[in-house]
């Protein structure tokens, strides 16, 4: 079987949804910026691309009409490069990488670009219009339970306290703030030139330009005392708050995958090798524990044990679920989200899987860690995990 390797990649900084720096920027434009930069970082690659695979959790409105195809056009790819938008909710950006890698491993592709794009400013998490199947809603309402309420269910079922959740959130912000101060994300980020329209002093519209180059959700001054003052967000007597939950965000990311032999022939140094990907199902009402099912499956496919993994990028949808995943699998917390997670850095849904993969790659290189895992829970009661090996 052929080897699938990642040879380049780039992501935008993550913006806060609604009022952040990317709120007015279309998600397909963000995706195109990342695709162009990914090609540039692959030595200005102009050869064959078998497919463009883009993950998106809410593929409608600005993210509809097979957004991946539009991203390819905006990025200047020839019309001969096909494209597909994939949706497995929060794992979409990792699913896109897996689809591309598995095609390469089978010999069906030799080169593909995978990624994810999401604007939670322009397309809300549940979409503009939600129409549940009434029969399913009556028979199994947990399939329509809000993500926040599932986080509360995890906290109650597994005894994850408010204090533990807040402490985990503080750690996320502290690690992210330290990483930002040390410039750890600079190599994975492509700055975005943003144009906004404002009303000038003469009361007429005027355009304003700025360059957005750094994740903007991190709050370095966050403390447990500050977080303890926040009210529960989903249940009157609950423990899940805005402070110990992931932020709604905007962003995009992309990576180029290649057959190892082709990369070597072109003189492109592989960053990591794709080892495996797995998904698993769990009760929808505790969807946050999804990685508990997915990680062991992915490790088995890769022929590895938990102790072989040096770094984990575990999406922090909510502190309650991230804590329970770590506890149940017995993961060393010092290996998890060493540069912060979604509570501090944001969670742009369909982009997240690719974003986390890029962050993992760069930290694996810095630490010379052989194996790393990207994992997340998925709305509806699932988990996903991908295993990567440093080249």
Curated annotation (Swiss-Prot):
Keyword Lipid metabolism: yes
Primary enzyme class: transferase
One Pfam family, short name: Thiolase_C
Pathway connected to this protein: Lipid metabolism; fatty acid beta-oxidation
Catalysed conversion reaction: an acyl-CoA + acetyl-CoA = a 3-oxoacyl-CoA + CoA
InterPro entries: Thiolase, Thiolase-like, Thiolase-like_sf_Thiolase, Thiolase_acyl_enz_int_AS, Thiolase_AS, Thiolase_C, Thiolase_CS, Thiolase_N
Name this polypeptide is given: 3-ketoacyl-CoA thiolase
Catalytic residues (positions): 90, 347, 377
Function comment: Involved in the degradation of long-chain fatty acids.
The keyword Transferase is assigned to this record: yes
Organism for this UniProt entry: Bacillus subtilis (strain 168)
Gene induction: Repressed by FadR in the absence of LCFAs (fatty acids of 14-20 carbon atoms). When LCFAs are present in the medium, they are converted to long-chain acyl-CoAs, which antagonize FadR as to its binding to fadR boxes on target DNA and thus derepress transcription.
Any single Gene Ontology cellular-component annotation: cytoplasm
Organism domain of life: Bacteria
EC number: 2.3.1.16
A single GO BP: fatty acid beta-oxidation
GO MF entries: acetyl-CoA C-acyltransferase activity
SUPFAM superfamilies (UniProt xref): Thiolase-like
Stored PANTHER family: 3-KETOACYL-COA THIOLASE, PEROXISOMAL, STEROID 3-KETOACYL-COA THIOLASE
UniProt keyword terms in alphabetical order: Acyltransferase, Fatty acid metabolism, Lipid degradation, Lipid metabolism, Transferase
Gene from which this protein is expressed: fadA
Family: Belongs to the thiolase-like superfamily. Thiolase family.
């Amino acid at each position: 079987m052929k080897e699938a390797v990642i040879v380049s990649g780039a992501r935008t900084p993550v913006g806060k949804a609604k009022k952040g720096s990317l709120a007015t920027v279309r998600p397909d434009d963000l995706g195109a910026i990342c695709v162009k930069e990914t090609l540039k970082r692959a030595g200005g690659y102009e050869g064959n691309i078998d497919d463009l695979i883009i993950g998106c959790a809410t593929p409608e409105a600005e993210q509809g009409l097979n957004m991946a195809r539009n991203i390819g056009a905006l990025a200047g790819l020839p019309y001969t490069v096909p494209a597909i938008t994939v949706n497995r909710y929060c794992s979409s950006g990792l699913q896109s990488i897996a689809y591309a890698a598995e095609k390469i491993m089978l010999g069906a592709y030799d080169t593909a670009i995978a990624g994810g794009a999401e604007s939670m400013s322009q397309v809300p998490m549940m979409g503009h219009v939600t129409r549940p199947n009434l029969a399913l809603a009556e028979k199994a309402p947990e399939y329509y339970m809000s993500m926040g309420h599932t986080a509360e269910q995890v906290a109650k079922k597994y005894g994850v306290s408010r204090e533990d959740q807040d402490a985990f959130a503080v750690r996320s912000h502290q690690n992210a703030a330290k990483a930002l101060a040390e410039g750890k994300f600079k190599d994975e980020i492509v700055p975005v030139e943003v144009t906004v329209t404002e009303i000038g002093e003469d009361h007429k519209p005027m355009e304003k330009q700025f360059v957005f180059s750094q994740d903007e959700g991190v709050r370095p001054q966050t403390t447990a005392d500050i977080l303890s003052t926040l009210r529960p967000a989903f249940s009157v007597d609950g423990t899940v708050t805005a402070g110990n939950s992931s932020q709604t965000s905007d962003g995009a990311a992309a990576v180029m995958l290649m057959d190892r032999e082709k990369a070597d022939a072109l003189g492109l140094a592989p960053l990591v090798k794709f080892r495996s990907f797995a998904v698993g199902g769990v009760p929808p009402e505790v969807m946050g524990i999804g990685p508990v099912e997915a990680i062991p499956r992915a490790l088995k496919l890769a022929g590895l044990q938990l102790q072989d993994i040096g770094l984990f990028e575990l999406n922090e949808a909510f502190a309650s679920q991230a804590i329970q995943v770590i506890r149940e699998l017995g993961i060393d917390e010092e290996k998890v989200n060493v540069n912060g997670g979604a509570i501090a850095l944001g969670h742009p849904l369909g982009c997240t899987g690719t974003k986390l993969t890029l962050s993992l790659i760069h930290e694996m290189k810095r630490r010379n860690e052989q194996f790393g895992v990207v994992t997340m829970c998925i709305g509806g009661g699932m988990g996903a995990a991908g295993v990567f090996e440093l080249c």
